């Protein structure tokens, strides 16, 4: 695995040993980051179900100001720290060994600019995360990788990459109505 773009472009990162981690492929990661390119500079990012840390490290490489990584598996936490050390990213990141849903349950609204999540497929975790985000929108943008057969709540924009999909949700701006209007008036381009 490698960092695709930014200051660490071409640098190799490693996945934790074993079959428990399903790293996001380069093609999917590139498409994911391309969708977020305008929001990444100086963003505060959260990488949930972080695995190797590839998503968060890619965001940092492309200009994010800080990234918190949340991962419950000890081998993955070690891999994230090792990858961050190799890249020199330790000063602009933190790793939390914790269940992702428990972590976000304590977050206030707008704690992050961007949340990227790649939960295990077919366990309902992606949908649970979206429901938690809707209850308290802890970021402006939530992106979730999931299997194309996993049902997610409506309201996101899904892009498919083989059997994987990435769905992007945006929180309404303060004062926006649910239907996308601001103060009862349609926004330009809405």
For each feature predicted by the language model, list its residue ranges:
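Class I S-adenosyl-L-methionine-dependent methyltransferase catalytic core
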Residues: 1-190
């Amino acid at each position: 695995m490698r960092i695709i773009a930014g200051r660490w472009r071409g640098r190799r990162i490693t996945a934790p040993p074993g079959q428990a981690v399903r790293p996001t492929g380069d093609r999917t990661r590139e498409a994911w980051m391309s969708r977020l390119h305008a929001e990444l500079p100086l963003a505060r990012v959260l990488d949930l179900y972080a695995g190797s840390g590839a998503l968060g490290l890619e965001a940092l490489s492309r200009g994010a100001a800080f990234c918190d990584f949340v991962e419950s598996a000890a081998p993955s936490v070690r891999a994230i720290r090792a990858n961050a050390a190799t890249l020199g990213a330790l000063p602009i990141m933190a790793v939390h060994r914790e269940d992702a849903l428990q972590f976000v349950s304590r977050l206030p609204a707008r704690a992050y600019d961007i949340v990227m999540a790649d939960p295990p497929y077919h366990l309902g975790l992606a949908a649970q995360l979206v429901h938690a985000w809707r209850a308290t929108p802890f970021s402006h943008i939530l992106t979730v990788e999931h299997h194309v057969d996993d049902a997610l709540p409506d309201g996101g924009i899904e892009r498919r990459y083989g059997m994987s999909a990435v769905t992007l949700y945006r929180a309404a701006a303060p004062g926006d109505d649910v239907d996308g209007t601001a103060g009862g008036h349609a926004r330009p381009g809405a």
